[in-house]
């Protein structure tokens, strides 16, 4: 994920991060708080569980899954924003695990691209301080709602998969029927980012009732097979496949990236 990334030249400013990047850094801040609380009382089991839950739930099951398309299929600011976020997380995480996984953490540190002032040995680094990436309660509440919506979409996609309507989730086009509050919440995220959040090819927002009822008040979800053809590079379905003569099996976005 960090292949070719140089933190000295490639890091982007905070205002260039996507909201999900800010969410990931806020989750890191919570980890820093919990790990420090464990270390302060020599409760290493608490540190272990905090690190484990962060890596499995916040990162592997969510953030890394959602950002795959941005990392592998695009160039530019979006990709660098994800890499900037992952680099900050990896540096902080390595410092957190150093007291209890000293050899593993040093092996990671040896491979990390360094910035000026970083020590040769991770055990000489100060622990990351809480508050640097903290998010306010409104932001956390917003993303708790977005994740709840995502969970409801996943249920409908599983049903569509069972009914042989789709195979992989990227074969799906999802319509979200919303009341005003849910519509405003979802519409605050760019549609391409919302589709990435759901890991589908297309998302449409509709005010009103429809689709399958969900546990999120004011939300109905419907899934269908996405129109268009499958891009061989990003696996998303698009009507722009073949629009670039030199790359007849790629969507317009991927063709432009390959040509760049």
What residues fall within each predicted segment?
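Acidic, turn-prone loop/beta-hairpin segments
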Residues: 2-36, 64-156, 160-184, 203-221, ...
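Short helix-adjacent coil turns
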Residues: 39-46
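Short metal-coordination and nucleic-acid-contact micro-motifs, chiefly zinc-binding Cys/His arrays
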Residues: 227-230, 247
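Short cysteine-rich clusters marking metal-coordination/redox-active sites
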Residues: 231, 251-254
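Cys/His-rich metal-chelating microdomains
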Residues: 237-240, 257
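Short linker/helix segments within small regulatory modules
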Residues: 240-249
């Amino acid at each position: 994920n960090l292949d070719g990334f140089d933190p000295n030249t490639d890091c982007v400013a905070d205002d260039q991060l996507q909201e999900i990047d800010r969410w990931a850094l806020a989750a890191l801040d919570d980890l820093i708080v919990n790990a420090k609380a464990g270390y302060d009382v020599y409760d290493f089991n608490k540190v272990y569980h905090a690190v484990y839950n962060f890596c499995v739930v916040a990162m592997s099951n969510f953030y890394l899954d959602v950002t795959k398309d941005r990392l592998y299929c695009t160039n530019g600011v979006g990709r660098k924003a994800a890499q900037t976020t992952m680099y900050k997380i990896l540096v902080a995480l390595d410092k957190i695990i150093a007291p209890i996984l000293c050899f593993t953490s040093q092996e990671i540190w040896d491979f990390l691209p360094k910035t000026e002032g970083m020590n040769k040995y991770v055990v000489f680094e100060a622990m990351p301080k809480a508050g640097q990436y903290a998010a306010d309660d409104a932001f956390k509440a917003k993303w708790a709602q977005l994740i709840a919506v995502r969970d409801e979409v996943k249920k409908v996609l599983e049903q569509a998969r069972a009914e042989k309507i789709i195979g992989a989730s990227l074969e799906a086009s999802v319509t979200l029927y919303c009341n005003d509050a849910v519509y405003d919440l979802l519409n605050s995220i760019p549609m391409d980012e919302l589709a990435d959040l759901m890991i589908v090819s297309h998302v449409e927002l509709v005010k009103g009732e429809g689709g399958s009822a969900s546990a999120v008040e004011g939300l109905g979800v419907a899934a269908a097979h996405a129109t268009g053809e499958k891009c061989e590079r990003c696996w998303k379905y698009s009507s722009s496949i073949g629009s670039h003569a030199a790359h007849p099996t790629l969507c317009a976005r991927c063709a432009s990236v390959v040509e760049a």
